[in-house]
Regions:
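Short beta-strand segments
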Residues: 108-109, 169-171, 196-199, 221-223, ...
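Phosphate-handling active-site elements
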Residues: 118, 128-130, 150-167, 249-259, ...
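Metal-dependent amide/peptide-bond hydrolase catalytic core
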Residues: 2-6, 15-30, 37, 54-55, ...
Length: 406
């Protein structure tokens, strides 16, 4: 199937083989079959979500998707409410109460994407070669679709109820740092038994993520002295030359074995080629695998001093997203998921990755957290973003059984 002929038409799913499965317990096999029979419906849900563009910086667009999702989750018996924001879309919380007591499971994700409004015109949602392509298909509208269908499956198996309390939180600012949603995420996590994050899996084998690096952002500004580069060269103090020396010093702080990396990603400075630059600025990305390394690298950066004493340095920033470390609670949750996957017929692998998510916040609180439970595919944030359709049923089955058992 080359391309959907009409954007709003129902997607016809290419015939692809389901993932090969081993002999599995009867109940797990029946549940997997439930989602295999609904593969087209899951794919159609992803298409609907992808075709409502939701860039982080466009509040009306994000709120349109939030309103649709509130209706979908309420149709499954949830109580939806919005945490209102001015600068970003409203954050959606959905609570599913049951007659059974106990702490809820928190299903965590985001509805914002990195693509600007209008991207669909040149990057339309389509199904081809067993994959669904489109902006946000993998990161993470497939994860949201899996939430919806896993909850639907649980209600089907439990007489239109859920086997335990569940809270869904879909934030609208994850792709831009989660500044407004972090307090909400942490508050809900503290009252939860576990947090299941529906960010994309790692690699085409669908590994879940049991560790993520923490993220920091710093800005280094150098103030020198401007002068004419021909007439008064000796009177000037080049901010760019000083910044270059600082960048060289910063590069020596990298320690790959400890999972500590620093990347100067942006540099600016100067006004004209015949003017010795009075100012120069560098923006720095810092990644730490262990929270205990964060204070040390922060101190080292703030301890930087000018090589040229006639220049001044100004250093701002800090670690804004703690690492998700593979704690005992995280490891236990992975083992539980791995056992479920085994019963469903495949081996679930785990991975440690350099990127951060909102799961970093919840794991840092000591709440058992498992990330990467969303779709399987490639190309997140890129023009070739896609999700693999044949993997959707078993991801939904894994999520449903994990919600039930944690």
């Amino acid at each position: 199937m080359k391309r959907a002929q009409k954007k709003k038409a129902q997607v016809k799913i290419a015939q692809v083989k389901a993932p090969a499965t081993k002999a599995v317990p009867a109940e797990s096999a029946n549940r997997l079959r439930f989602f295999l029979d609904r593969k087209d419906a899951i794919t159609e849900t992803i298409r609907q979500l992808v075709e409502i563009e939701s860039p982080s910086d466009n509040k009306p667009a994000v709120d349109r998707l939030g309103a649709l999702l509130a209706g979908r989750f309420e149709g499954l018996g949830g109580h939806a409410k919005f945490h209102r924001t001015q600068d970003f879309g409203d954050h959606l919380q959905v609570d599913f109460a049951t007659e059974r007591s106990g702490k809820p499971v928190l299903l965590l994700g985001h509805i914002d994407t990195v693509y600007p409004l209008g991207t669909l015109a040149g990057m339309p949602c389509r199904v081809d070669d067993g994959r669904l392509w489109g902006p946000g298909a993998l990161d993470m509208k497939s994860g949201i679709a899996l939430m919806l269908h896993a909850l639907d499956g649980l209600r089907t198996w439990h007489n239109d109820s859920l086997p335990r309390p569940v809270t869904v939180l879909l934030v609208s600012d994850e792709e831009v740092g989660s500044e407004s949603s972090r307090p909400i995420t942490e508050s809900l996590a503290r009252r939860s038994a576990a947090v299941l994050v529906l960010e994309p899996s790692y690699g085409l084998k669908g590994a879940v993520k049991t560790a993520r690096k923490g993220v920091g952002e710093y800005t280094i500004k150098v103030m020198g002295k401007a002068a004419h580069s021909g007439l008064d060269f000796d009177e000037g103090e080049s901010a760019i030359v000083e910044l270059a020396r600082q960048i060289t010093a910063i590069s020596k702080l990298v320690d790959v074995k400890r999972g500590l990396t620093l990347n100067v990603g942006l540099v600016s400075g100067g006004t004209r080629t015949n003017v010795i630059p009075a100012q120069a600025t560098a923006s720095l990305d810092v990644r730490v695998a262990r929270m205990k390394d964060a204070p040390g690298i922060d101190r080292q950066l703030r301890a930087l001093r000018p090589f040229n004493r006639k220049c001044k340095l100004e250093i701002k920033g800090g670690i804004n997203r703690p690492p998700m470390e593979r704690t005992a609670g995280v490891a236990a949750l992975y083992r539980q998921a791995s056992e479920i996957a085994k019963h469903l017929g495949w081996k679930l692998e785990e991975a440690s990755v350099g990127g951060g998510s909102d799961g970093n916040f919840t794991a840092n609180l000591g709440i058992p957290t498992l990330d990467g439970l969303g779709g399987v595919g490639e190309g997140a944030h890129a023009t070739h973003e896609y999700v693999t359709i044949s993997e959707l049923p078993r991801r939904a089955a894994l999520l449903a059984e994990l919600i039930e058992s944690v």
